[in-house]
Amino acid sequence: MRSRDLRAEMRVPVTRKGALSSGDTLWFPCLIVDMSDSGILIMSNREIPVGEVLDFRCEFFPNQYLECKLEIVHVDDTRLGTKIVEIDEKGTSLCKLFLEEQYAHKLDSVRLK
């Protein structure tokens, strides 16, 4: 991934359950708060230090899971700011499609008000 200012990217509010793992077989739950194409803001009750790289898994569409590695870049109470540090082509396409659908849904909601 290219180095860039993550705040310059559009963040899409999302509420979706996911799971994190530190590489062992134990997964623990998390909740996506928002995301961009290069990072995800997550809520978790686990204390995870900045710099740690975790496996992430989330079902974006029925039987279609995003699986990638996230690096913790900042921690604020129960929220973890992460950047995607490893993702395959399938995951990139799935993430892009999911973000496009979420963004379109948010735009439709604003137009209806």
Predicted regions and their residues:
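Short, conserved beta-turn/loop elements at beta-strand boundaries and strand-helix junctions
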Residues: 23, 37-38, 75-80
